[in-house]
Regions:
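Conserved acidic carboxylate
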Residues: 10
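Two-component/phosphorelay signaling modules centered on CheY-like receiver
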Residues: 13-32
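Acidic, metal-coordinating helix/loop segments flanking the phosphotransfer/catalytic sites
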Residues: 20, 33-51
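Alpha4 helix (beta4-alpha4-beta5 surface) of REC/receiver domains from two-component response regulators
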Residues: 86-104, 114
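Acidic catalytic/metal-coordinating carboxylates
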Residues: 36, 62-66
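Active-site residues of response regulator receiver
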Residues: 55-56, 83
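C-terminal output helix
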Residues: 89, 107-117, 124
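Short amphipathic alpha-helix used as the core "switch/output" element in two-component signaling
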Residues: 65-77
């Protein structure tokens, strides 16, 4: 069985590298690290990851929620938001994209891996077909 593909979208390089190392150690294939929404959309279009680990506040014009919205126009990967934001407006916008989970930083690495496993299991073969 091929390893599940995960795109890490995080503008803090140190955090992104730590997440990438943990994911690789757990047997996942990290398709890339994106620091901007534009880079996330481009990476997802070419690699079709099974899951997006998405920060909300990113460098550039597009935040993580908008990036997920654009990616979901093409196909429906599982989504886990990993962010420091927890205000009601941001959470409402994020929940409209139907993520599997919304983890607030700092988070326990074990919890992240549990959420990833559950999201991939619930999404069936890794990614759901695009909605009409």
């Amino acid at each position: 069985m091929e390893p599940k593909k995960i795109l890490v979208v995080e503008d803090n390089v140190i955090v992104a590298m730590e997440i990438q190392a943990r994911l690789r150690k757990a047997g996942y294939l990290v398709t890339g690290i994106a620091a901007t929404g534009d880079a996330a959309v481009q990476n997802a279009a070419t690699t079709h990851p099974d899951l997006l680990l998405m920060d909300i506040t990113l460098k550039g014009e597009m935040d993580g929620i908008e990036a997920v919205t654009r990616i979901q126009k093409e196909y429906r990967p599982a989504v886990i938001y990993v962010t420091a934001y927890s205000n009601e407006e941001v959470m409402t916008r994020a929940m409209a994209t139907h993520p599997h989970a919304y983890l607030t930083k700092p988070f326990e690495p074990g919890e992240l891996l549990r959420q990833i496993e559950e999201a991939l299991r619930l999404s069936g073969n890794g990614s759901m077909p695009s909605l009409p």
